[in-house]
Amino acid sequence: MQEMSRRNQHFTDSVIRRMTRISNECGAINLAQGFPDFDPPKEMMDRLEVVSHEGPHQYPITMGAPNFRQAIARKCGHFMGRTIDPETEIVATIGSTEAMVDTLFALMNPGDRVVMFSPFFENYRAQVIMADCEPVFVPLNPPTFSFDPNVLEDAFRGGAKAIIICNPSNPSGKVFTEEELKTIADLCIRYDVYAIMDEVYEHIIYDGRKHVYMNSIPGMWERTVSCSSLSKTYSVTGWRLGYAIAPENIMARIRQYHDFNAVGCPSPLMEAAVVGLNMPLSYYDEFSAHYAHMKKIFTEGMRNIGIPFTDPEGTYFVLADISPYLKKGQSDVDFCEQLARKAGVGAVPGSSFFNEPINNIVRLHFAKKDETLYAALDRLNHIKDMM
């Protein structure tokens, strides 16, 4: 038989989804894959029930149902501080994952270089490679996960065409400051680089910090694509609804790839999601307060147990240091498998997020009901006995 594609020969299956499968097999509490165990807003579920009987159930307009795009334009326009045209500057996608892939194919040519920070969400490397591009990594330095502007400029100077930024950042929990984003923006403008933003955690930020949108920085709207989804903000990770926002000339290219890649998003889910997108502003305050509550439970529990970790500025992830529990020669992958099978808690090995040779970090998440978090902490409290 003829040779299969070489595009995916250098990456494996998703480590995150693998840990979910292992957690399911052994009945572990899944703190690996970042999805909640509580319901989305009741208003959205009630609307979905009605839509299930009334429709729509057929193909939508490829770019997304008009009322869905209009709701995104209103909601995002408020938070971004600009008017967004739903007819020319938005496309609905199958989660932010598809938005990122469509954007890469719309902007990049084979061999182009894409800068990303390390640690990074594992999908980014695979997506860049699938686009026949070269990933270039710039380290975020713990514990604050700051970056060296000179190192970043070296990466740009080497011929970068785009930079991918997750803000707030998965897995580090870093929230990029306005000053940091302006530093990146200056480099993007100077070296003519596109900014591809993954902003799915935009409303999960702690301790009075503020999410700054890259496309709101002067000179950046013209070269920025903002990718996001409803998965986190409305607790509907299984609905797979996302979107991209970009200037008209870029959006026209993204829509072409979306059209032939996905045809469209699920019609009934877009209809039900409009209710969520039209929630009053108080919803986002209550949503943020709920996540601050879950974070407090989990981080206080981790401190009481004595597991070292990095306190996140945003997102619902914690990077924990497993150095005290690693056996000699044990990999972080094996540790996580044993943690799921013996301690009953699912985690993700940190090596799947870092370009650097990391073996002592795991990622845990706390988007769970109180009782789930307390049960997970109780199991982690016996980690020394069970490993």
Residue ranges and their predicted role:
Residues 140-207:
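Active-site phosphate-binding strand-loop segment of PLP-dependent enzymes
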Residues 223-314:
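PLP-dependent aminotransferase class I/II
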Residues 86, 106-165, 178:
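PLP-dependent aminotransferase-like
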Residues 291-292, 305-342:
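Conserved PLP-binding catalytic core of the aspartate aminotransferase-like
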Residues 26, 131, 190-191, 305, ...:
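Helix C-cap/helix->beta junction micro-motif
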Residues 74, 154, 328-330, 338-347, ...:
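PLP-dependent enzyme catalytic core of the Aspartate aminotransferase-like
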Residues 2-95, 102, 278-279, 386-387:
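N-terminal small-domain helix-loop-helix segment of the aminotransferase-like
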